[in-house]
């Protein structure tokens, strides 16, 4: 079973430590909320977990049955949804999905049309993403993350821009995902991580001068 272990990790920008001496372990069936005020370093930690930015100290290890997975293979295992990750604006919805599945196939042989029904956007399949509303974009990003055949789900501000119906959809989807994946939610909004019993508060890993 996949695990992600953090051993005394630290990240700084210029001279400012964003977090330091952070040790933690993530595993399946134990969703974790990364919490802390605006600007505390939640997104920075999420990006470090994804291997998208380097850390300055310590070690992040992905391992399966004690076998270490090389850094360059982490991306195959993870799905990441975040407001700052871009969609390809020129593509239609159907083109976006077909492009995505070339790199990250859907789990359980799900078809594009089934997927479009699940994200409740089938009637917009030929619309360019550049004409999508913010909530439609968010459902597309979340849907791709939930339904790709990956084992780690990184969700940064998952319900931003979602209305109540979209929020309820998110909760039902994430509850399914928890059973099969390592789920990590970064958030300022308690109701979007209500299913997380354990919290990682970035403020606990700030350096006291
Ligand atoms: N590339 C960068 N270069 C320099 N400083 C950065 C960089 N990225 C982030 N920071 C700084 O790191 C700190 C943490 O930012 P981060 O975006 O991780 O916070 P956050 O907890 O996700 O905030 P929010 O809740 O507002 O989304 C901030 O002070 C930010 O300005």
Predicted segments, located by residue:
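Catalytic Walker B motif of ABC-type/P-loop ATPase nucleotide-binding domains
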Residues: 153-157
């Amino acid at each position: 079973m996949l695990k992600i272990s953090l051993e005394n990790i630290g990240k700084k920008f210029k001279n400012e430590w964003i977090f330091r001496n952070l040790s933690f372990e993530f595993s399946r069936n134990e969703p974790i909320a990364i919490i802390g005020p605006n600007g505390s370093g939640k997104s920075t930690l999420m990006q470090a977990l994804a291997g998208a930015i380097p850390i300055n100290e310590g070690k992040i290890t992905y391992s399966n049955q004690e076998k270490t997975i090389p850094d360059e293979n982490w991306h195959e295992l993870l799905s990441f949804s975040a407001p700052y990750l871009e969609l390809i604006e020129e593509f239609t919805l159907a083109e976006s999905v077909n492009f995505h599945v070339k790199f990250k196939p859907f789990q359980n042989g799900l078809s594009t049309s089934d997927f479009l029904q699940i994200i409740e956007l089938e009637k917009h399949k030929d619309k360019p993403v550049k004409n999508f509303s913010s909530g439609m974009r968010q459902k597309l990003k979340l849907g791709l993350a939930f339904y790709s055949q990956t084992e780690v789900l990184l969700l940064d501000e998952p319900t931003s821009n979602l209305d109540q119906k979209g929020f309820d959809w998110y909760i039902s989807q994430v509850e399914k995902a928890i059973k099969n994946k390592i789920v990590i939610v970064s958030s300022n909004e308690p109701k979007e991580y209500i299913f997380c019993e354990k919290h990682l508060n970035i403020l606990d890993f700030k350096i006291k001068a």
